[in-house]
Amino acid sequence: MMKISYHLSLLCSFIYLAGCQKNGEIIIMGNGLVIEDLVIGEGSEAQDYNKVVVNYTGTLEDGSIFDSSLKPGGTPFTFTLGVGSVIKGWDLGVKGMKVGGKRKLTIPADLGYGNNGAGNVIPPNATLTFEVELLEVEVY
């Protein structure tokens, strides 16, 4: 009975904290995804099946940038949330953001490119960090 009470208390705490978004808040998900709200947006909220437009910068554990929409000649990236068109860490980490918001996502390998990595840019089993800014949400 005490074990159930503990788990219920933990669940209630998580639900409470999930509703208290503020700048600098860090959430560590059970799957290892770390979400840090850098700026809380005030626009539309991104949900599954919405088309979203983001600016992003991706870095490896050593801090080296492997990709960015902000590089010279870069453009914002558009994708449909929650349909698997991007790595799982993005689908999970962008969901719930509001337009104008910025998040730092630290994505473990199994929610990124896993054992295979990606070309010669992302090594196998790499933890990735993305700073993502939500620019637009289009509801279908």
Where are these regions (language model features)?
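Cross-family detector of peptidyl-prolyl cis-trans isomerase
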Residues: 3-9, 16-140
